[in-house]
Amino acid sequence: CTINYIHDDFLLHNFEEKYDYIIGNPPFFKMKSTNKLLNVYRCNAINKATTNICSFFLDKAINLGNYVALVFPKFLLNTPEFAPTRSYLSEKAIECIIDFGENGFPGVLVETLAVFINNLSRPSNTRVASITHGKYLSQSQKYIFDEKLPYWIIYRDSRFDEVCKKLDFNVFKVFRDRQITNSQLSDSGDIRVLKSRNISDDGKKIINLSDYDSYINYEAL
């Protein structure tokens, strides 16, 4: 058995062959628009709607590997910028999703999961495991990746379906609050960010507070 180490930028390296397995933990961060590598990485990306570098790693791994297993931010399941990714992955066999919650990396409050993708098989059942809750399920991939829903609902069940029947969808656009950090906020900007103290106890009024009100610019989203 021979081990060949390749010390290079994975996203730029020209691989001459495909691999049986690609296993990894790519970096998670949004690249700045001023970064010259952003457009270079995007050239070969499947999902060109995002600037998050982890997406470029996933796209390249999918093109290179027969079987791909990656640790990934949990926002893969539900953020709009990853809708193109969910679309193409839905056509592949997602054999397992392990939900680590915030327990993936000690001291880091980022929810993560591991996704196992079989490029040589057709979609069937997906094993879903919640490390946080000790929950283990076998779900129909078609059921939890239902095209009628905007997100992947990996814990979907009959109770969820009953609630869905009573709701009107596509009324609001959602942005997960954990994607917004204090470093992105300022006292002026394009979009007002409402925090807990900005909302009255009865939920009917917006309260303006000096030295507390925050804004975020479009480019940070």
Language model segments and positions:
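Short catalytic/ligand-binding loop motif for oxyanion handling, primarily in non-cytosolic enzymes
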Residues: 14, 30-33, 77-80, 106-108, ...
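Conserved Class I SAM-dependent methyltransferase catalytic core
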Residues: 47-102, 109, 114-117
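Conserved proline-anchored active-site loop of SAM-dependent methyltransferases
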Residues: 9-13, 17-37, 55-62, 68-75, ...
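C-terminal substrate-recognition regions of SAM-dependent nucleic acid methyltransferases
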Residues: 101-221
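Short glycine/proline- and charge-enriched loop/turn segments
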Residues: 36-45
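Conserved SAM-binding strand-loop segment of SAM-dependent methyltransferases
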Residues: 2-10
